[in-house]
Amino acid sequence: LVGSEMCIRDSESTGLTDEETDALQSEILNETQDIELPNNSNVYNILLIGVDRRDKTWYGNSDSMILMSINKDTKQIHMTSFMRDLYANIPDVGVKKLNAACAYGGGPLVVRTIEDNYKLPIDNYASVDFDSMIDIIDAVGGIELSPSDDEVRVANNYINEMCKLRNADASAHQYTSSGDQHVDGYQAVAYARIRYVGNSDYQRTERQREVLSKMMQEMKS
């Protein structure tokens, strides 16, 4: 992310050796995509946080962090994903993976961590877990997706897991084929969670933005 300087402080404050700090800095530079973040007075930045938690007793890790930047002049929307496995200096915690900020302090700490590390103002945020996302997508009537054979195979495993947690009938929500189709909330969320098909987490963030974009299209129609 061009113009975003990940802040890692001295080894005394983080508990890391100089070698470990240098290694983290190198990983950040290697894994950071070359994208210009919207950052001016005409842009309204909303951080969308997708939370992975199995129960309601803790905040959970942030499985997805997408900055939705709305240009107030052109009305265009730009979406930028933050990679969950990047290391960041979490305020009052130390250097951890970026997705851990949510577990330590919920949405407010995720916002503060991204603002501090990326020097980026965030005007508001919204946080949603898998359960809520399933219900939201079902409420808009589902979305259009075109999963591959490999994506269908992995997504069905996630569907089984989510249906078990929600006491739902997995057979009613399983993908039965690949290709263009209208999917429900379970299928869409499972698709967005896929990580080990394609280019690892980079392609997962693409799927997450795709699902979000398709959902917004349905809401406008």
Name what the model sees in each region:
Residues S4-S221:
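Non-catalytic, solvent-exposed segments at the cell envelope interface
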